Design a protein with these regions (language model features):
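Ligand-binding pockets and gating/stacking loops
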Residues: 1-139
Length: 139
């Protein structure tokens, strides 16, 4: 279905103006917690590594951005060294969910820093104060 959608959008000349995003807010662990049974297959939420793909709408086609270790457990740099996400320091070639949201909003023409709402006396943003637009994936 995804292939058909993208093929049709491209054929109709609509892909450049349409951003297709497929993903979730977290990955899944690659191991079991507890005994493996039919009722308990043990794959838990895993926010350290997740997969999202995007097409059209200003995204460079055919690239991969970021990577995990061989187990899909931790983020790694291009040399395979584990990266511990640091909200105070952005690391090139990694993408936090705040960066993903900032990039999607940018592709939609929205400045993520201006998308702010006040709740209980505090200003909040979807991208928190840490989001960066990842220009390496934008055409």
């Amino acid at each position: 279905a995804c292939y058909a959608l993208i093929t049709d959008l491209k054929r109709l000349g609509m892909l450049d103006d349409t951003l297709v995003v497929w993903g979730g807010e977290f990955g899944r662990t690659n191991y079991c917690q507890g005994k493996l049974t039919r009722e308990n297959y043990g794959r838990d939420h895993h926010p350290r590594a997740f997969t999202t793909w995007m097409a059209g709408g200003g995204v460079k086609p055919g690239i991969t951005y970021g990577q995990s270790d061989d187990f899909g457990y931790n983020l790694t740099d291009r040399d395979g060294n584990v990266i511990k996400p640091n909200m105070d320091h952005w690391t090139k070639d990694t993408m936090h969910v705040h960066d993903l949201n900032a990039t999607i909003l940018h592709l939609l023409g929205i400045d993520h820093r201006k998308l702010t709402y006040r709740y209980q006396g505090r200003d909040f943003r979807l991208t928190d104060i840490h989001g960066h637009v990842i220009k390496d994936i934008i055409t």
